[in-house]
Amino acid sequence: YRNTIAAKQVDPRPETYYYKIDIQPSVIFTLGEHHNIGLTFEYYNLREDVEMTLSNLEQAQHFFIMKGLGYFTSDLGGNYVRRQYNGNSVGGELQYNFKGDVNLIVTGSWARKVEDVTVPIATQPKKQGSVVDDRLKVSLAANTTTRGGYTHSVRLSYQDRAIDGIEYVQKYDNNYESQDWITIWKGIRSQYRTHHIDFNY
């Protein structure tokens, strides 16, 4: 469990509160003298509240919202501007270990994080956007010790990461029965894909 103030911010003006709860249960199975299999499950929940207040309440100020890489939209802020970030991540990892003249470890993991941004307006929060972050990673590590006492280690890893940036178009329904924000349109406005290969000896 982690709770911090002014987390991951670049602009020092907002007041930011952040917490994260992380659970990682794991189990290891031993098969004979040389083989081990491990399983790890990970889940975490995060929440970040950002609030920016103005020292001059008589004049509204412009601020900018980043939407995608290098793309901003301007907005007008009054007494305070608030954003709430709620995220959940689920993933798992499989490990295999061989112990012998050469120690070998093979791992494969996958995780998906979904983070939603909302604007807390009274009791009906308005959706600002969402981010879906998928990560797939495989790695191979081996080491051995020669007769001369020298240890040789090698590690090869590959990671595939895909990020979708989702935006919403919402309209407020002022009917007495609903009085809530209605999503008219939801779509992926930005996509990022990265591949990373790492080799160490």
Predicted regions and their residues:
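Transmembrane beta-barrel strands of outer-membrane/channel proteins
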Residues: Y1-N3, L39-N45, V106-R112, V154-A162
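Extracellular/periplasm-exposed beta-strand and loop segments of Gram-negative cell-envelope proteins
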Residues: Q9-T16, M52-Q59, M66-S89, V114-D133, ...
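Residues on the lipid-exposed face of transmembrane beta-strands in outer-membrane beta-barrel proteins
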Residues: I23-F29, G92-F98, V138-T144, I197-Y201
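Surface-exposed extracellular loop regions of Gram-negative outer-membrane beta-barrel proteins
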Residues: Y1-A7, K20-Q24, I105-A122
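Detector for outer-membrane/organellar transmembrane beta-barrel domains
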Residues: G38, E42-Y44, N97, S153, ...
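Outer-envelope beta-barrel architecture signal
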Residues: E33-I37, V90, G100-V106, T146-V154
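Internal, well-ordered domain-core segments that constitute the primary functional module
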Residues: Y1-F72, G91-E93
